[in-house]
């Protein structure tokens, strides 16, 4: 999608291809963490292969998207800005910003994240729950090269992922019990590095924390509706999922591609892009897929964020079986890459 939109070339130099994903399941104290499942490059339809995924710094993605928007003469950026209220007038949506500026449009899209103010103003309720877990993210430099390998350690408190970045650097993202996370985040630099060392387990040689510590509480929420008259939700405003599979951004991209396709198709047919008839197609397309993804990630978190002996034995057996079935692994890699199901045209490298 990013290539089709002409954005990828502004990101490629900072993107790290992931050529292999290793999955382990063990306790924090285990000195040896055997690899139970290994994914390699994703097979393409023409019989070739490409990286299973890419790790892209958020700053690089934001910079490339902002540059693309700034270079388009038909787009007007009003930022920073906050919506005070909006009203469906029947033929348009009347939007009033906090500074009093008034805007009229055919459609308003709520994409401002989990705490979406526009979603609340549209009276769209959500359903969900808190996990009692906290995500911790930082960046490390390390002695040994990662060779483009991503590692997912399933530990009793939750997954610990080592995601490769350009050079001898990696992004760490791990899930901890909320109380334990508070303890870890309050440590001094030496104490925090010791916690990192325990989890990296010598895999990358000597390590150094080179990025800030970031954290946020984990929860799941799903909007009860994705659309209202002249209003549509997408991304985290529509669905907040557990990061166990790292698919939150990819789900948002699918929303963007699907909504764009629905709007363009409607306008080509002379239809109203903000009508419920038009927006209903988007909701039918994306709501069920997002629900199934959220349910799957929720189930994976419950399955792997515990240390029950019987459950561990069963899940390790299951991972071993998957590792021995190449076709199933291929399907799972394509699923993780967001390349299955009813794909929008932008996901098939087709322009709208």
Which ranges hold each PLM region?
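Acidic-histidine catalytic/liganding microenvironments
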Residues: 5, 72-73, 325
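Residue-level signal for inorganic ion chemistry
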Residues: 2, 65, 162
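A general structural signal for well-ordered alpha-helical segments in protein cores
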Residues: 20-21, 58-62, 66, 133, ...
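Conserved FAD/dinucleotide-binding core of flavoprotein oxidoreductases
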Residues: 33, 38-47, 155-217
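FAD/FMN-dependent oxidoreductases across multiple families
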Residues: 180-276
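C-terminal helical "tail/cap" subdomain of flavin- and related membrane-associated enzymes
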Residues: 261-352
